[in-house]
């Protein structure tokens, strides 16, 4: 399962770095940030490329920082043409829980359900 963290600024990069400090290096865990000099369209294009570069059959789970924020909206706009799971309001404990679920071979859907409980 590929996990893609998306945020305002460098929050997602810091989140990924912190998670890897806690649980070790992670494959298929990437971070994207929306910076003031970028447009939402540019971020959306990068995220779509990340989706398209994912091997067929591999699940994708997006983690975003803020409900209805621009990164959230960019991810949601991609749901029209792509199938993936999405959790918003992400923080370090939640991201660690996602990684632990991945270690336990849980599906993206199982991880999302567990977090919502």
Regions picked out by a protein language model, each given a short descriptive name:
Residues 2-117:
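N-terminal loops that bind phosphate or other acidic moieties
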């Amino acid at each position: 399962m590929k996990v893609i963290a998306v945020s305002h600024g460098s929050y997602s990069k810091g989140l990924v770095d912190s998670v890897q400090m806690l649980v070790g290096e992670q494959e298929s865990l990437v971070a994207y940030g929306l910076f003031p000099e970028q447009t939402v369209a540019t971020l959306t294009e990068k995220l779509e490329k990340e989706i398209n570069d994912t091997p067929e059959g591999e699940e994708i789970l997006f983690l975003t920082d803020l409900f209805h924020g621009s990164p959230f909206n960019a991810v949601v706009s991609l749901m029209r043409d792509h199938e993936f799971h999405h959790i918003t309001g992400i923080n370090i404990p939640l991201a660690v829980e996602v990684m632990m679920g991945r270690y336990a071979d849980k599906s993206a859907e199982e991880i999302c359900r567990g977090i919502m409980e």
